[in-house]
Curated annotation (Swiss-Prot):
It comes from Candida albicans (strain SC5314 / ATCC MYA-2876). Keywords: Cytoplasm, mRNA processing, mRNA splicing, Nucleus. Residues 1-11, 41-53, 624-635 have a biased composition (Basic residues). This is Protein SQS1. GO terms for biological process: mRNA processing; RNA splicing.
Length: 705
């Protein structure tokens, strides 16, 4: 008997993988991984180098690529230490990288990192303008103030023109300064330029004041104009009135040119004035105010009385209030917070509003009172005097401002005579207006009563049995066309043509519908009543050969028919899908699958199915009987319909029936009981009626009348 311990260590010699319950180094409970050298050590000892590592066999796959090119061992070790990915080939790595790039590009722009780089220099367009003016400048007499003007960032400046009046000596000095500063143009500072501009402007204002104090008469003005005409040969002097009235046009021209030319002519008089054009970037309102203060009264164009009247009229008539959104104060409230889709008026006006703060939801519209809306809007920045414009803005034309319609002029009479006349007219209109006393149209009424077959029978009780439908009408004998035979023949001819054309159109429509069903493979129209087993097989063959079609649907059949279709689908290796509702509307849909293109159909089993049930009727359509069968079913009672009497409207039932003769057994029995012709049935004191109750035929209505 072997020991228990030997049995536990059974298979321990199989290698390092043998453990508790292990057998020959296999993976057991507690057994390790089976190594290639330990499992067969006892039976088949390994050949060659016994000290090689267990990975040497698996390294050949790492050392060889797809083209069987040797890769050194160091490179394989580096590759094994790299991040392990599921892709090993180069093309797969490229696809892996491109997929990550697509993920990166699909992210939103605001989630991407953005780097801001500080510029080395501050961009100043005035430097570029100055250099361009310097290159284009060819005259030496340009004033230094023209080139030394720069934009001030603290003020929103717009260019306009000003008049510089100074003496000839100052102009010469400015020319010298320009020559000196032309050498040191690169060393200028903005503060120095600003100070120099202010000094020039102060000198300009002083000169203007001196001119206004010295020249008070009109002669001085004319003298100045003469001096200006002398200077016009060198520089065109702009009109002062045009400068004041239309500053923006000259501003654009001055900016496009980027230079101003001013040349000075000397004069012996101390009061000689020479004009200089200076461009200063200032806002339009500041320019106008500066020009109004700097120019004296004599330089201002005299205003006509018409202009004064126009100004007074403009001041007297207030301007219309602008729409909401044209004022700065309108932007204190965010209009996108509120959206109105409808408005309704009543005791309390309401708005159909979508607003997060009012309704508590982002996408839901709720009816809210107008007072609540106004209170919310005023609290969030809308001014009270702009409230009406705001409400009209958010409604967006939902409220149509209708012009008041003029009230119709109503005539009010002093007496009640007109009211009495109107009452009489209403009373007369309710009565019958036919003049019964007159003899008009009396002959027509008499002729109608003579020709009418039904006499004075009411319209409800008249006979309309002669109104035969057109599809059942064959002749027009019921009409009074005895005298005119040609008219009756033409009507019959037209009726026959109508029936023939209608039958032909119906046949053409059915043929067209059948062709379309065949073209679109619609079995509901192709097989209106039933399907043959050969038709089902041909449909499967057409679906198998047609590459453009992937499925087809059969009409609703009985359970055995559906089972037959499933068996044929298995033979053609196609799948079956049950579609429609349970019952009459349930049908089968055949769909191709992968096996359809891999395997051939099982024609042996198909032939066995073809030898089975041949015809399968549709259960969603009623069976159509043939015309012969239909006539037999109606005339199965001994042709009672052919001999049945036909009655007209108002005929008395049994009026033309013959009297029961004395040979009748029933009459003989009554006579034996004491009945005499002309008397009622029964004993004395309890006899019945002498005449029978009349029964009239009623075809237009049902019921008893």
């Amino acid at each position: 008997m072997p020991k228990r311990g030997n049995r536990r260590r059974r298979g321990g010699t199989g290698g390092s993988g043998g453990g508790r319950g292990g057998r020959g180094g296999s993976r057991g409970r507690g057994g390790g991984r089976r190594t290639p050298s330990g499992a067969n050590r006892g039976r088949h000892p390994s050949r060659g180098n016994k000290n090689r590592s267990p990975r040497t066999i698996t390294q050949y796959g790492d050392l060889m690529d797809d083209d069987n090119i040797f890769i050194p061992k160091t490179m394989s070790e580096v590759a094994s230490n790299m991040g392990r990915r599921k892709y090993g080939g180069m093309f797969e790595e490229i696809e892996y990288t491109e997929s990550h790039q697509e993920d990166l590009m699909s992210r939103q722009l605001r989630n991407r990192p953005v780097e801001f780089v500080k510029a080395k220099e501050v961009y100043d367009p005035n430097v570029i303008l100055y250099k361009l003016a310097k290159l284009n400048n060819k005259d030496d007499g340009i004033d230094i103030a023209v080139q030394s003007i720069s934009l001030d960032d603290s003020e929103n400046e717009s260019s306009t023109n000003k008049v510089d009046i100074s003496s000839s000596e100052e102009i010469e000095e400015s020319g010298d300064e320009y020559e000196d500063e032309q050498d040191d143009e690169d060393d200028w500072d903005e503060e120095e330029l600003h100070n120099e501009i202010t000094t020039k402007l102060e000198a300009l204002e002083e000169a203007m004041n001196n001119v206004s104090s010295d020249t008070e008469s009109e002669q001085s003005v004319s003298h100045i104009e003469e001096e200006d005409e002398k200077v016009e040969s060198h520089i065109p002097e702009p009109d002062l009135s045009a400068e004041v009235d239309e500053p923006l046009q000259e501003i654009d021209e001055s900016e496009n040119e980027n230079q101003m030319e001013s040349e000075v002519g000397t004069n012996t008089n101390t009061q000689d004035i020479e004009t200089l054009d200076i461009i200063i970037d200032l806002p339009s309102n500041k320019v106008e105010s500066h020009m109004s203060h700097s120019l004296p009264q004599k330089f201002k164009t005299p205003s006509s009385p018409d202009d004064d009247n126009d100004d007074n009229n403009n001041n007297s008539t207030p301007e219309s209030e602008p729409e909401y959104g044209y004022l700065e104060e309108d932007y204190e409230f965010d209009v996108s917070k509120i959206e109105v889709s409808n408005v309704r008026f009543g005791i309390e006006n309401q708005y159909h509003i979508k607003c997060m703060e009012l309704t508590g939801s982002i996408d839901e519209y709720i009816w809210i009172d107008e007072n609540d809306v106004i209170e919310y809007v005023l609290d969030n920045g809308v001014k009270e005097h702009r409230l009406n414009k705001f409400l009209s803005f958010i409604t967006k034309g939902m409220i149509d401002e209708q012009e008041p319609e003029p009230e119709p002029e109503v005539y009010i009479s002093d007496s009640n005579s007109e009211e009495e006349e109107e009452e009489e007219d209403d009373y007369n209109s309710e009565q019958d207006d036919y003049p019964y006393d007159s003899d008009d149209n009396l002959e027509d009424l008499i002729a109608y009563s003579k020709t009418s077959t039904q006499g004075l029978i009411p319209f409800e009780d008249r006979d309309f049995s002669n109104n035969i439908p057109s599809k059942k009408r064959q002749t027009f004998d019921h009409l009074d066309f005895d005298d005119d035979g040609e008219l009756q023949d033409s009507l019959i001819r037209q009726l026959n043509n109508y029936k023939a054309n209608k039958k032909l159109k119906k046949h053409q429509w059915e043929q067209q519908k059948l062709e379309e069903s065949i073209l679109h493979h619609d079995m509901l129209i192709k097989y209106p009543v039933s399907l043959h087993i050969k038709d089902i097989k041909s449909e499967f063959d057409q679906l198998l050969k047609d590459e453009s079609r992937q499925s087809m649907s059969f009409p609703t059949l009985d359970t055995h028919g559906h089972k037959t279709i499933k068996n044929l689908a298995d033979c053609y290796h196609m799948s079956v899908i049950k579609s429609g509702k349970q019952g009459i509307r349930k049908y089968l849909k055949i769909v191709k699958n992968k096996a359809t293109f891999k395997y051939y159909p099982n024609y042996e089993r198909i032939n066995r199915i073809l030898r089975g049930r041949p015809i399968f009727h549709r259960i969603d359509q009623k069976p159509q009987h043939k015309k012969g069968e239909k006539s037999k079913s109606k005339s199965s009672r001994g042709d009672a319909s052919s001999s049945r009497a036909r009655f007209k409207e108002g005929d008395i039932v049994g009026a033309e029936a013959p009297e029961i003769g004395s040979s009748n057994l029933g009459r003989q029995m009554l006579e034996k009981l004491g009945w005499i012709q002309g008397q009622g049935l029964g004993v004395d004191g309890n006899k019945g009626i002498n005449e029978p109750i009349l029964a009239k035929v009623k075809t237009s209505k049902t019921g008893i009348k």
